[in-house]
Every structure is written in structure tokens, then in C-alpha cells.
Amino acid sequence: MSLDELIDQIPAYAKDLKLNFSSLTKQQTELTPQQLWGTVVASAIASRNARFTEAALSDAAVQLSPQGLEAAKSAAAIMGMNNIYYRFTHLAKNEKYATLPTRLRMNVIRTHGIEQVDFELWCTAVSAINGCGACIDSHEQVLRQKGFSEEQIVAAIRIASVVHALACVLDAEAALPTQSATA
């Protein structure tokens, strides 16, 4: 199923999300196609809705190179780990945790095989979904140092927020007994 077909099933109470997704994926000008579709994929995976993720991967396979698709999946995977670890060290009152060695492998951050700024952008989007302020700050700083504008960064965050919200709606609709999710 394509994303458009899946989005058509979103109920009327989430019409704003449908419209936002359409405009963010079809009318935005701040991001390259790779940046946009990598953000959609990484955000879908981070949002943990199987139907949305399946549709996003299917649509993105046409938009991204195999290497780009793999890198977007890698960004979601590594940030799934890092966001928990660094959110803990950031939020814990005991400051010693932040000084202890991480001892977690993160090689994919340097070996993903695509443009570094695109990978950083996807990591920032996933970090926003997962609520890790330390990771958001770290990746946003790299993006700004590499010449990304605030507008480009927030374009990816808009996509992440809408993808996450749509995934939540799909989860809620799936939990309803014998009701179909029609618009």
C-alpha cells in the first residue's frame, strides 16, 4: 500500500494531519528529495507503526537510492539506542553518568555512505520524535556548522511531527473494535 492510499484512510478528526503530510511531501522546497524521503523513512521507523513504516519504505524505495534507504533506516536504528542513553545521562540528576564512558558502538554515524548532513538531519528528526534534547542539540549544531539553515532543519522536524502524529492515529484506529478508519 502506498502512503497516499494509507493517508486516505485517516479519519476526519485528523484531516489537518492528512493535509499537512500532503503539503510537506509535495510542496516543500527547503529539502532535497533525499533529505525529505530519508526523513519520512527514519521518522516512520521511529514512530513504530508497522503499516506507516511499510508504506513509507515502499514509497521511499522509488525516491531514494538503496544506499540512501539503508542510511535512513540506520539513522532510526542508531538513534533508537542513542536517544535513550543520552536522554538518561542528560536528565539524570547524578552528573557522574554523563562523564562515564558510553561503551556503545555507533560506527554507522560515520560509515553510512551518504552525505553527512542528510544523515545528521535524519538523526535530528528521530531525536525530536524520541524526545532527546541532548541529541537534538548535538545534531542540530553539526547541521548549522555545515551550513544548514533553521528553515531546513525545521522542515524536517515538521515532517517528523506529522509522521509521528499519523502513526499515532493509525495505532488508535487499529485499537478500535471492528471500526474501519475511513475519512
What positions do the PLM features span?
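Hydrophobic alpha-helical segments
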Residues: 1-183
